[in-house]
Amino acid sequence: MSPKDLTIPTGEDGEGSVQVHLDESDKITGAKVFAVYGKGGIGKSTTSSNLSAAFSILGKRVLQIGCDPKHDSTFTLTGSLVPTVIDVLKDVDFHPEELRPEDFVFEGFNGVMCVEAGGPPAGTGCGGYVVGQTVKLLKQHHLLDDTDVVIFDVLGDVVCGGFAAPLQHADQAVVVTANDFDSIYAMNRIIAAVQAKSKNYKVRLAGCVANRSRATDEVDRFCEASDFRRLAHMPDLDAIRRSRLKKKTLFAMDEDPDVLVARAEYLRLAQSLWDGLPPMSPHSLPDREIFELLGFD
């Protein structure tokens, strides 16, 4: 599109980015689909895995899809690093018809089904392609037919077209943040990206999870200013750190008081997401406004 163009052509979404339209046959139907975003290292995989476990405790059939080349999204559910879709495709010279479900889908805690999409080497390819191929494989093998909940755990705070690919499938996006400036700044960018995509996709913002935070005052100030909402608060508990070291979800840990507190919050979050949330119309804040709101005096 030329800089002189004054209108965005039909078929594009957000800031002039080209929208890749999904084939109808590749759409996920019959399940509630959530995409989990947040600043790199904020605890998205911990949040996603414990949320998947919580949904399973509520009796839901859950599939978690890790969308990070590190392929560690599901290791607390499975207890190991499982092969990625991109790796098993390489093994068959990218002939997906030669793959069996057991080659790339692994059962984890309480029956949660786990898939690691993986990704191309750094600086090459597009992560969005890998996500698309993963969903196609799942559809071809009818692995989504009996699923109630699908959770995409998405790489870092990347909001390019590639790693926005899960938004094409998601009903709602959940943002993981912390009670600090950098995390909230990243959340603001993610809100802008999701809102742009929601012009043409069904995805809507569900809200944020304040993770590894003793307090939530900064998160709450931002939410008030942006008409966003906080869905849950996961305190900075050593039990959560230990669960990662033990390769377990909180629901597989011994029942000490901190573990029970965190479990209860995840179960409450899962139930609220399942029941559905009132619609909202959040807006991202200009950079200067965030600095004035949360920056140092």
Swiss-Prot record:
Listed cofactors: [4Fe-4S] cluster
Pfam families per the UniProt record, alphabetical: Fer4_NifH
Residues at which Mg(2+) binds: S45
One Gene Ontology molecular-function label: ATP binding
PROSITE patterns: NIFH_FRXC_1 (PS00746), NIFH_FRXC_2 (PS00692), NIFH_FRXC_3 (PS51026)
Family that this chain belongs to: Belongs to the NifH/BchL/ChlL family.
Name recorded for this polypeptide: Light-independent protochlorophyllide reductase iron-sulfur ATP-binding protein
Gene designation per UniProt: bchL
